[in-house]
Amino acid sequence: MTTAKINLLDFDRKGLRAFFSEELGEKAFRADQVMKWMYHFGCDDFDQMNNINKKLREKLKHKCEIRAPYVSEAQHSSDGTIKWAMKVGDQDVETVYIPDGDRATLCVSSQVGCALECKFCSTAQQGFNRNLKVSEIVGQIWRAAREIGLEKETGRRPITNVVMMGMGEPLLNMKNLIPALEIMLDDLGFALSKRRVTVSTSGVVSGLDQMTGKIDVALAISLHAPTDELRSQIMPINDRWDIDAFLASVRRYIASSNANRGRVTVEYVLLDHVNDDMDHARQLAELLKDTPAKINLIPFNPYPGSPYKKPSNSRIDRFMKTLMEYDYTVTIRKTRGDDIDAACGQLVGDVIDRTKRTKVKQQGEAIPVKTV
């Protein structure tokens, strides 16, 4: 019987040091050396780690591996966006590279599929399979950095920002999200500024409260409606944690955070004649009066079978101007990669639905929201 090798990408620095000490009988600085090779140099071959002695390299080759998801398909948009289908086990998740001037953002997935069933999101329609491991989260960044490195002749910018806005709800995968974020921020990891790593949540209050005081990164919240009645219609998670509970948790987090500079980014997808009336804008402005926020409006990105439409430019403009009358900073997200279905809300991947979703829908029952 062959013993499975330990994937070193599953460890943050603390975990890697413990593994080296307890399982390999090595000192902490050896773990630090290997971590630097993995993340600073994108190395997955122990023999190339030339400041590691041969005995340890042989031990590592026997017991360990450095294995990231691999690219099963790549699609290139006319605007420079790249969508990679990355193989995790027997399925794919989608990772999106978005260049924009002097920055390049990587949109990273946290789950295979999603359990939350937001009505306007194509990922939610695919069902939920499982949480991604630490190695499968940071491995998306590792693999993307290597892919970009192979294309240096094209002048593509290295990754400067990471947003946890791909497939899945990050805060329903807290066990693996926290160490993955630690690796992103670690000087021996990807060494990203905490202001350049963003976690987006649809309202998992228990997870956000776990993050408070534990990990400091930029926070974005998927709000998408100004009232509980409307939000529950398009985001079933609101039946578990309503808007007041969600925003109270947000205020607790930003009060303990330096990365957010005292305010949160509110994401609001605009659905034609659903949540984009002027009354909705005024309700949203009133709702956020006690929660320091900048508002990012996202015109709906259509996908096959969706019942929703993108609002007209005039409706989008009126909504934005109404919010600005209340002195909010308001931006409209530029649609990127929509020609390859890589825009916000369009990520699907290759998901085998292992929830009870299909059966439940056939029986007309309510679908429970999974909690941490």
From Swiss-Prot:
Binds 1 [4Fe-4S] cluster. The cluster is coordinated with 3 cysteines and an exchangeable S-adenosyl-L-methionine. It is found in: Cytoplasm. This is Dual-specificity RNA methyltransferase RlmN. Keywords: 4Fe-4S, Cytoplasm, Disulfide bond, Iron, Iron-sulfur, Metal-binding, Methyltransferase, rRNA processing, S-adenosyl-L-methionine, Transferase, tRNA processing. Its EC number is 2.1.1.192. Disulfide bonds join 107-344. It is an enzyme of class 2 (transferase). [4Fe-4S] cluster binds at residues 114, 118, 121. It comes from Aliivibrio fischeri (strain ATCC 700601 / ES114) (Vibrio fischeri). One of its GO terms (cellular component) is cytoplasm. S-adenosyl-L-methionine binds at residues 168-169, 200, 222-224, 301. The lineage of its organism: Bacteria, Pseudomonadati, Pseudomonadota, Gammaproteobacteria, Vibrionales. Residues 100-339 form the Radical SAM core domain. Pfam families: Radical_SAM, RlmN_N. Its cofactor is [4Fe-4S] cluster. The gene is rlmN. The keyword Transport does not apply. GO terms for biological process: rRNA base methylation; tRNA methylation. It catalyses: adenosine(2503) in 23S rRNA + 2 reduced [2Fe-2S]-[ferredoxin] + 2 S-adenosyl-L-methionine = 2-methyladenosine(2503) in 23S rRNA + 5'-deoxyadenosine + L-methionine + 2 oxidized [2Fe-2S]-[ferredoxin] + S-adenosyl-L-homocysteine; adenosine(37) in tRNA + 2 reduced [2Fe-2S]-[ferredoxin] + 2 S-adenosyl-L-methionine = 2-methyladenosine(37) in tRNA + 5'-deoxyadenosine + L-methionine + 2 oxidized [2Fe-2S]-[ferredoxin] + S-adenosyl-L-homocysteine.
